[in-house]
Amino acid sequence: MNSIIGENMDDKHLIETELKNNTLFTGRIINLRDDDVLLPNGKQAKREYVEHRGGASILAVDDDKNVYLVRQFRYPYREVLLEIPAGKLEKEEDPATTAARELEEETGFVGDIKPYGLIYPTPGYTNEHLYVFLAENLKRTHVHCDEDEFLDVVKLPIQTVLKDILDGRIKDGKTCYAVLKYAVENKLL
């Protein structure tokens, strides 16, 4: 089966052009924009979106096919979510460095890390991009969360995590992406 993405298709009829950059709010982590754009049909429109420098996440799998996740309260949803470790990119920081740091800080593990993908979590209203990594050959160190982070580390068999994703109990997009990719690559589905 061929994909239509990246097959020399002409995208000109889809592209919007920025006419004016309007920054409404500049924050520590995000900026809010309301840009004027030129549509492909020649009309003008507004595009509200959140600027974010991006982040890195990491799927940690041990030799017995257990996955290390974190349970943490996510204020925008007013809910405790189960997720792979992740964090925002620091200025000019390599995404692999961010992922390794977050893995150790949040779970107390280090391991062999390899790139595992790039996702756009919510392309309808933010330019955030999230690098995904895989960590294997895990070695225990110690957890040392940031002072404003409160979380539990959870070790689960990957089959349990897959079931929880497919049953809708794990709702976090980066976690679903990483676990499902791992499951497909390792013929676990």
Predicted ranges, named:
Residues A45, G54-S57, K88-K174:
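Unchanged
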Residues D167-L189:
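Long hydrophobic alpha-helical segments typical of transmembrane helices together
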Residues E16, K20-S57, D63:
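Acidic, metal-coordinating catalytic segment for phosphate/diphosphate chemistry
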